[in-house]
Amino acid sequence: MIIIGCDYHPGFQEIAYVDTETGDCGEQRLEHGEGAQAFYRDLATQGKKVRVGMEASGHARWFERLLAELNIELWRGDAAVIRAKRGRKKKTDREDARHILNLLLTGDFPQIWVPSGENRDLRQLLWHRHRMVQARTRVMNQLQAVALNEGLRCKKKLWREHGREQLEAFRLAPWASRRREDLLQLLDRLNPTIAELTQAVEREAEKSPQAGQLMTHPGVGALTALAFVLIIGNAERFQCGKQISAYLGLVPLEDSSGERRRLGHITKQGNSLLRFLLVEAAQVSSRTIPEWRSKYIHLTMRRGRKIAKVAMARKLAVRLFWMMRKGWNYQQIVKFGSHVEQPEHRHGVQ
């Protein structure tokens, strides 16, 4: 078996490898493109099992496809854990490749869960819609500014038929008029695109039984449910609500020592899109569920609105996690609670 530690960069990769059968080892720098492809294709022809370990990266899709095509095993590792396991102060690309190879050989490589190709493609749908909505919001804000400069303040009514007629009727200077026309054209192109993407999200959510169960929770729509299912993946990876909160970056930073305990802002680790959607959905849930509404008002008075929103988002994330893990809908999770059949754990924490 050939084991390879790969320090991956956008334009090249530094590798350190060893053949566990013959003991042959070496180091090499591979330029991406023909150089890397020729090296791995040559390995595949040798008839030996090959395992490549590298830090998780979002810019290596072509490399992952190449190794999958050649039936070469690829392990992705947690970059933060790999960095923490490095003992030497000297850091070079060659040292990093050696370090990854050593972790693979000793069995300490922190391998992480990797979503499937279909999962990743559906995430692109969610991100594309999210970016289109952000672009539309920027366009609408600029048009609101144009209306305010002309003394028209009608907020959401500006996007109705009468409001648009008022906006188009303003007599503006030449370049201001050009700006208004271009922004309106952009808005007219974005609206049908977003509507089409929203319908696609709803269709994909209908195909997923897990998303359908999550959508029974008040405030959780197709977008939030599908995003939660795609990003969490296998719910069995997590043992308790604290782990899911930490995975989504909804827990505070902590810098404690001795008797001093200092908590900061949330870590914001994990997927920012799902965190955003949970905050939005939690506000709707807080208006719908009486107990949550009381909790939200209490937190708002004690800690402020921003902290209260994040706290409710964390509460929603934990509840959706247990619904997904147990395969329950909203009525079942309310009736039986999150931690039924777990007498050995208190509050789901090991």
What are these regions (language model features)?
Residues 1-350:
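A detector of single, family-specific signature residues
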